[in-house]
Each structure stands twice: as structure tokens, then as C-alpha cells.
Curated annotation (Swiss-Prot):
The gene is hemC. It comes from Geobacter metallireducens (strain ATCC 53774 / DSM 7210 / GS-15). Tetrapolymerization of the monopyrrole PBG into the hydroxymethylbilane pre-uroporphyrinogen in several discrete steps. One of its GO terms (cellular component) is cytoplasm. The porphobilinogen subunits are added to the dipyrromethane group. This is Porphobilinogen deaminase.
Amino acid sequence: MAPKQLRIGTRASQLALWQANWVKGELEKRYPGMAVELVKIKTMGDKILDVPLAQVGGKGLFVKEIEEAMLRGEIDIAVHSMKDVPTEFPEGLGLYCITEREDPRDAVISRGVKFADLPQGARIGTSALRRQAQILKVRPDLQMVVIRGNVETRIRKLTDENLDAVILAAAGLNRLGFADQVSEYLPVELSLPAIGQGALGIECRLDDETIKDTIAFFNHPDTAHAVRAERALLWRCEGGCQVPIAAHGQVSGDTLTLTGFVASVDGTRSVKDTISGPVTECEKLGIALAEKLLADGAHEILAEVYQREVAREKEIPV
């Protein structure tokens, strides 16, 4: 039986609140009479806005404080953008649901110019190293400008910082009603998305059977399989915000196709490959693709980016 009250932990950004309110609305529709409360929590990633994420370092910049609140019993579930969720969780917590994915692509907002027609040396604003690496791979003449802040702030920087274009995740723009400002959607072949891009994750205490039963309906199996494969690849590559790693999985029937990409920050060296297999083996596929990328040159690229060796072998947790 569903609880009478449920507390959702969320960041206080415009997009995070949209996502948490969407979950709240779906819960209230399914369980009339349930009192759902949003608990806003400020994370380290929200506090440090003047430094690129890659330089802040560490993992879980947008989730750690929320998880701590859950461990203290102050919230029942947490709603995250899947691309912000680390591959490992504090003991007792876990990712129980992954929602149906929104548009996973990256979107360009420019001054009416298509990406292919951007002038030589154009200034492009983005927050993600994987975008930067992939864009520079095809257009090494472009100047990449690191932008931070919420979606609206980043769009405003097009004018405020005299940029020629900004690149953001399409999902966030769609959710917040900014789709009409998009000049162009970049195909995944050009800009492979971040791990989990477009999907939401719902985290809870793994021993709370009532909450798990209550939220189970949010899980979208095809998206969950695809995202778990992407996350397995990231886990094997020991990835975080400070490295250009991208992956995108797609499910068709019983088959999962996963593409992965690892690059140097300037895009001059990169390795990309695709693997297919049974959807039931999603995490094994992610690790197998990661092993292939590492063997084909990603190991050396990552060792340079991390300034340390990447494990030649990694034991899969039971």
C-alpha cells in the first residue's frame, strides 16, 4: 500500500524543479490523496558556479548532499538527471527507476546560423568536455567557451558573452519550453550524448519496500536497459565530469545497440565503436564495449586526462 505522504529530494534549479514536479504530478495522479512534498537541497555543483565542472573534480557534484539527506531519513526519494548520477552509490541507496528518455540529442541555439555554416573561429558556449571534444574533432577552428549556470542563464550568455552559438541538451530545453529557440539538433553521429542524457533516475533506500512498490511504475524497461549499458561503460572507464566520455544505447526488440566514445579534451585523439547484443545483458555489453575502447587507445587517453593509470582489469561488483 502506498504511503500517505512522500518527500522528494531535489536540487533547486529550474530544470530540477520541473523534473521533481513532474514526478510529483504523476504520483498524485496515480495515488489520489497522497501528500507529496518537494524538499530543495543545495549541492556542491550548485554552489561552485565560477569554475568549470572538469576542474572542480570528484563525482556526485549534483547528488551527494541529496543522498546524505536520504540517509538521514529527511527524504524518501530523489529525482536526478541521469547524466548527473555517479555509477556507485552510498551503502543502502540505489537507483530503482529510470524513466522514459526524452530527446537524447544535443541542441544548438545560434543567431540563425546552422552548425555547418558557423564562421571560421566562431565562439561556442558549452559546459561539457565530451561536446567540446566531439565538436573540435570536426571543427578544430572553433573556439570553445565554458559556460555554467541554469538553462536560461546559458541561453542568455549567447548575447551576454557575444557567442556565436551555445550547445545544450535538447531534453532540458524541451522540458522548460525553450524548444522554439533551437536552431538545430545535432545528430548523435556528430555529438554522441552524455551517459543517461534525457532520462530521469529515481533513487531510494533499498530496504524501503513500500517506497519501491510505490515508484516502480516510473521505470521504462527499454530506457533502463540502454542507460544501464551506458553507465556500465562509464563505470569501467572510471569516468566523471573531468573526462570526455559519451555513450548512447538504443533498444530494438530484444537487441541493444550501444555506441561509445572516448577522446582527449581537444578532440585530436579519439576512439569510437559500437556493439550489439541481447538487451538482457545490457551491463555486460557496456563493459565489453569499454574494454574494446580501452584496448583501442582509450586507456592511454584516459591515463593522460586523469594523470594516473586506469585499471587494466576491473572486477564487476556482485
